[in-house]
Design a protein with these regions (language model features):
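Histidine/acidic residue-rich metal-binding segments in metalloenzymes
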Residues: 147-157, 179-218
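Short, intrinsically disordered, charge-balanced linker/junction segments flanking boundaries
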Residues: 14-15, 66, 214-218
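Bacterial N-terminal signal peptides
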Residues: 2-12
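N-terminal hydrophobic targeting/anchoring segments and the immediately downstream early-domain regions
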Residues: 16-186
Length: 218
């Protein structure tokens, strides 16, 4: 206890005599955010643009619109979100392709002065130099590949650069945390052999493996 009291006293005295940092001005904040490349790694606004929402208009129901993105945002990973309901009747790939198309068509092509499609780090830097927002894509939910490495490669060719192995639902090759305690769900104890093939292929392609939502075993 004696040593603890001495330690606390030393910390207190040090804090009292530490030089005060000068307040940061708004101009400094603007300079840093203008020079740095700020990257948002997940944005679900695509679930609205796919239904006709124009990202250039103020968004009163969400947090993303072009006027706010112009506040020094450098790059945006738009979510290729595929709800688990699309697994039924094998509609996951159809939905994924629609979500990819809304990024390429409704966002990038519709606003060429503000966005540029990016698939590499160099693309992001080049977009920053042009004072444009780099638009990237990440799939949310590995069921989007419909158990096909060919589809995975197709998504990569279309510009997808990361994929969450699962969303809230366990798929045919990876366990999710969202239904980990559901006795009605068939779990695999992590990744199946095919699931490991998916990860290996993602590594080979250069697609980031996102483990958000996955079970610990996965």
């Amino acid at each position: 206890l004696q040593y603890l009291l001495l330690f606390l006293l030393a910390v207190t005295l040090t804090a009292q005599h530490a030089p005060r940092s000068k307040p940061v001005t708004q101009a400094e904040v603007d300079r840093i955010t203008r020079e740095a490349i700020l990257i948002d790694t997940h944005d679900d606004v695509t679930s609205r643009t796919v239904d006709g929402y124009d990202i250039a208009k103020p968004n009163t129901r969400g947090q993303t619109d072009l006027p706010r993105m112009k506040g020094f945002l450098g790059a945006e990973f738009f979510a290729v979100y595929v709800d688990a309901s699309y697994v039924k009747d094998n509609h996951s790939a159809n939905r994924a392709l629609q979500m990819i198309d809304t990024v390429r068509t409704d966002i990038v092509a519709a606003h060429p002065n503000d966005f540029v499609l990016a698939t590499t780090a160099d693309d992001i830097i080049h977009a920053h130099e042009q004072h444009k927002i780099a638009a990237l894509m990440g799939i949310e939910g590995g069921h989007a590949i419909e158990d096909s490495l060919r589809l995975l490669r197709d998504y990569y060719a279309l510009g997808v650069r990361y994929m969450t192995l699962t969303h809230f639902n366990t798929n045919n090759w990876a366990d999710a945390q969202g239904d980990a305690t559901d006795p009605k769900v068939l779990h695999h104890g992590g990744l199946t052999p095919f699931g490991k093939d998916v990860v290996r292929e993602m590594n080979r392609l250069g697609m980031m493996v996102d483990i958000s939502h996955t079970a610990d075993a996965t």
